[in-house]
Protein backbone atom coordinates (compact mmCIF):
# COMPACT_ATOMS: atom_id res chain seq x y z
CA UNK A 1 0.00 0.00 0.00
CA UNK A 2 2.75 2.45 0.87
CA UNK A 3 4.51 1.69 -2.41
CA UNK A 4 1.83 3.21 -4.65
CA UNK A 5 1.58 6.62 -2.91
CA UNK A 6 5.39 6.78 -2.72
CA UNK A 7 5.68 6.01 -6.44
CA UNK A 8 3.10 8.67 -7.27
CA UNK A 9 4.90 11.21 -5.09
CA UNK A 10 8.23 10.47 -6.80
CA UNK A 11 6.63 10.70 -10.25
CA UNK A 12 5.02 14.02 -9.35
CA UNK A 13 8.33 15.44 -8.09
CA UNK A 14 10.14 14.24 -11.21
CA UNK A 15 7.57 15.74 -13.58
CA UNK A 16 7.41 19.03 -11.70
CA UNK A 17 11.20 19.27 -11.91
CA UNK A 18 11.03 18.75 -15.69
CA UNK A 19 8.45 21.49 -16.04
CA UNK A 20 10.93 23.97 -14.54
CA UNK A 21 13.82 22.97 -16.82
CA UNK A 22 14.72 25.71 -19.28
CA UNK A 23 14.38 25.03 -22.99
CA UNK A 24 17.56 24.68 -25.03
CA UNK A 25 16.89 28.11 -26.53
CA UNK A 26 16.62 29.84 -23.15
CA UNK A 27 20.37 30.44 -22.71
CA UNK A 28 20.83 32.37 -25.98
CA UNK A 29 17.54 34.21 -25.40
CA UNK A 30 18.69 35.31 -21.93
CA UNK A 31 22.02 36.49 -23.35
CA UNK A 32 20.18 38.40 -26.09
CA UNK A 33 18.13 40.14 -23.41
CA UNK A 34 21.43 41.34 -21.89
CA UNK A 35 22.51 42.55 -25.35
CA UNK A 36 19.25 44.48 -25.88
CA UNK A 37 19.41 46.05 -22.42
CA UNK A 38 22.99 47.26 -22.95
CA UNK A 39 22.22 48.39 -26.52
CA UNK A 40 19.17 50.38 -25.47
CA UNK A 41 21.23 52.08 -22.74
CA UNK A 42 23.85 52.87 -25.41
CA UNK A 43 26.37 50.92 -23.31
CA UNK A 44 28.96 49.77 -25.86
CA UNK A 45 31.04 47.97 -23.21
CA UNK A 46 27.93 46.09 -22.05
CA UNK A 47 27.13 45.10 -25.63
CA UNK A 48 30.71 43.87 -26.14
CA UNK A 49 30.49 41.70 -22.99
CA UNK A 50 27.85 39.55 -24.71
CA UNK A 51 30.46 38.59 -27.36
CA UNK A 52 33.24 36.01 -27.12
CA UNK A 53 36.76 37.45 -26.83
CA UNK A 54 37.51 36.40 -30.43
CA UNK A 55 34.04 37.09 -31.84
CA UNK A 56 33.46 38.28 -35.39
CA UNK A 57 31.19 41.22 -36.21
CA UNK A 58 30.16 41.44 -39.87
CA UNK A 59 28.26 44.71 -40.35
CA UNK A 60 26.64 45.25 -43.74
CA UNK A 61 28.88 47.20 -46.11
CA UNK A 62 31.81 47.29 -43.66
CA UNK A 63 34.94 45.21 -43.03
CA UNK A 64 34.77 42.31 -40.59
CA UNK A 65 35.78 43.17 -37.02
CA UNK A 66 37.36 40.71 -34.58
CA UNK A 67 37.48 40.84 -30.79
CA UNK A 68 35.51 42.56 -28.07
CA UNK A 69 37.54 45.79 -28.15
CA UNK A 70 36.87 46.27 -31.87
CA UNK A 71 33.21 45.38 -31.30
CA UNK A 72 32.95 47.84 -28.39
CA UNK A 73 34.51 50.60 -30.52
CA UNK A 74 32.13 49.84 -33.42
CA UNK A 75 29.04 50.10 -31.23
CA UNK A 76 30.35 53.21 -29.46
CA UNK A 77 30.76 54.83 -32.88
CA UNK A 78 27.24 53.78 -33.86
CA UNK A 79 25.79 55.22 -30.65
CA UNK A 80 27.76 58.44 -31.15
CA UNK A 81 26.35 58.67 -34.70
CA UNK A 82 22.75 58.44 -33.48
CA UNK A 83 21.86 54.75 -33.15
CA UNK A 84 19.74 54.59 -30.02
CA UNK A 85 17.38 51.61 -29.78
CA UNK A 86 16.87 48.06 -31.03
CA UNK A 87 13.92 45.69 -31.05
CA UNK A 88 14.70 42.09 -32.00
CA UNK A 89 12.30 39.27 -32.81
CA UNK A 90 13.73 35.76 -32.98
CA UNK A 91 12.54 33.88 -36.06
CA UNK A 92 14.36 30.64 -35.29
CA UNK A 93 16.90 29.39 -32.77
CA UNK A 94 18.57 26.02 -33.38
CA UNK A 95 20.68 24.62 -30.53
CA UNK A 96 23.08 21.69 -30.70
CA UNK A 97 25.22 21.13 -27.65
CA UNK A 98 27.27 24.25 -26.95
CA UNK A 99 26.43 25.95 -30.26
CA UNK A 100 23.30 27.79 -31.33
CA UNK A 101 22.29 29.64 -34.49
CA UNK A 102 19.73 32.41 -34.21
CA UNK A 103 17.94 34.08 -37.10
CA UNK A 104 16.08 37.26 -36.13
CA UNK A 105 14.43 40.33 -37.50
CA UNK A 106 15.18 43.72 -36.00
CA UNK A 107 14.21 47.36 -36.03
CA UNK A 108 16.92 49.86 -35.10
CA UNK A 109 16.30 53.52 -34.34
CA UNK A 110 18.85 55.79 -36.01
CA UNK A 111 18.21 59.46 -35.30
CA UNK A 112 14.58 59.85 -36.43
CA UNK A 113 14.48 56.76 -38.68
CA UNK A 114 13.36 53.20 -38.05
CA UNK A 115 15.55 50.73 -39.96
CA UNK A 116 14.27 47.16 -40.34
CA UNK A 117 16.49 44.22 -41.15
CA UNK A 118 17.49 40.67 -40.35
CA UNK A 119 20.48 39.00 -38.77
CA UNK A 120 22.08 35.67 -38.03
CA UNK A 121 24.05 35.08 -34.87
CA UNK A 122 26.19 32.11 -33.90
CA UNK A 123 26.18 31.60 -30.14
CA UNK A 124 28.68 29.50 -28.20
CA UNK A 125 28.39 28.35 -24.61
CA UNK A 126 31.72 28.68 -22.82
CA UNK A 127 33.27 26.63 -20.06
CA UNK A 128 31.63 29.05 -17.62
CA UNK A 129 28.24 27.93 -19.08
CA UNK A 130 27.54 31.47 -20.36
CA UNK A 131 26.25 31.92 -23.90
CA UNK A 132 28.14 34.51 -25.94
CA UNK A 133 27.99 35.64 -29.55
CA UNK A 134 30.72 34.10 -31.70
CA UNK A 135 29.59 35.70 -34.96
CA UNK A 136 27.03 38.37 -35.82
CA UNK A 137 26.05 39.35 -39.37
CA UNK A 138 23.17 41.57 -40.45
CA UNK A 139 21.75 43.71 -43.22
CA UNK A 140 18.82 46.05 -43.61
CA UNK A 141 15.71 45.25 -45.61
CA UNK A 142 16.35 48.27 -47.90
Where are these regions (language model features)?
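Short, low-complexity N-terminal intrinsically disordered segments enriched in polar/charged residues
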Residues: 2, 16-53, 69
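A mature extracytoplasmic/lumenal domain signature
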Residues: 51, 61, 92, 105-106, ...
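A short gly/proline-enriched turn/hairpin at secondary-structure junctions
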Residues: 55-66, 77-82
